[in-house]
């Protein structure tokens, strides 16, 4: 049995593909850098699309400066999107920075740091996992 997707999910996937092509081929702005669309959330009435993006920033670029430059292109991107998709209403596009990758890396680093601190403290006290398991037997 195949999975059923709602109309908003199908439209969201289509918008993600089309927006990626538009940003790659039609938006020419050196301030933006390399953009990846990680997700698109569409409102139930298909009037609004919240586009989550990440950036590969080069040099002095920051995600905030890239996002500000990208937001200047919201109207032209919506117009290009309207030419590509066959919907009665072209959704209003809102770009939002997706920090889940950055937060995930930060959390991973924190966990690694805690594990390394714990290992260092065990070595300083003269106990390791092997000596603990031998003492328990």
Swiss-Prot record:
GO MF assignments: ribosomal small subunit binding
BP-aspect Gene Ontology terms: maturation of SSU-rRNA
InterPro entries in UniProt: KH_dom-like_a/b, RbfA, RbfA_dom_sf
Free-text function comment from the UniProt entry: One of several proteins that assist in the late maturation steps of the functional core of the 30S ribosomal subunit. Associates with free 30S ribosomal subunits (but not with 30S subunits that are part of 70S ribosomes or polysomes). Required for efficient processing of 16S rRNA. May interact with the 5'-terminal helix region of 16S rRNA.
NCBIfam families: rbfA
Quaternary assembly: Monomer. Binds 30S ribosomal subunits, but not 50S ribosomal subunits or 70S ribosomes.
Protein name per the record: Ribosome-binding factor A
Species name: Vibrio atlanticus (strain LGP32)
